[in-house]
Curated annotation (Swiss-Prot):
PANTHER family (UniProt xref): 50S RIBOSOMAL PROTEIN L31, CHLOROPLASTIC, LARGE RIBOSOMAL SUBUNIT PROTEIN BL31A
Gene: rpmE
GO-annotated biological processes: translation
Protein family: Belongs to the bacterial ribosomal protein bL31 family. Type A subfamily.
Protein name: Large ribosomal subunit protein bL31
SUPFAM superfamilies: L28p-like
Functional summary from the UniProt entry: Binds the 23S rRNA.
Cited InterPro entries: Ribosomal_bL28/bL31-like_sf, Ribosomal_bL31, Ribosomal_bL31_A, Ribosomal_bL31_sf
Cofactor or coenzyme needed: Zn(2+)
GO molecular function, one term: rRNA binding
């Protein structure tokens, strides 16, 4: 095996917006901020968030539902 062709591994710290801190090793190293992690992601926690905010689906149906009735 050739010597010194592989990058060096450094300690990397990933901090989630929920406060969870993950320490691992990476070739990039350094600190990184995450939006979601396995501790707060809805898929892993089982808590689903409501996607319809402000009646966006109703607004869409009202706007484009009328187009369908005109063609019929």
């Amino acid at each position: 095996m050739k010597a010194e062709i592989h990058p060096d591994y450094q300690t990397a710290t990933y901090t989630c917006s929920c406060g969870n801190v993950i320490e691992t090793r990476s070739t990039k190293g350094g600190d990184m901020a995450l939006d979601v992690c396995s501790a707060c992601h809805p898929f892993y926690t089982g808590k689903q968030k409501q996607a319809d905010s402000g009646g966006q689906i109703d607004k869409f149906k009202q706007r484009f539902g009328m187009m369908r009735s005109k063609k019929d």
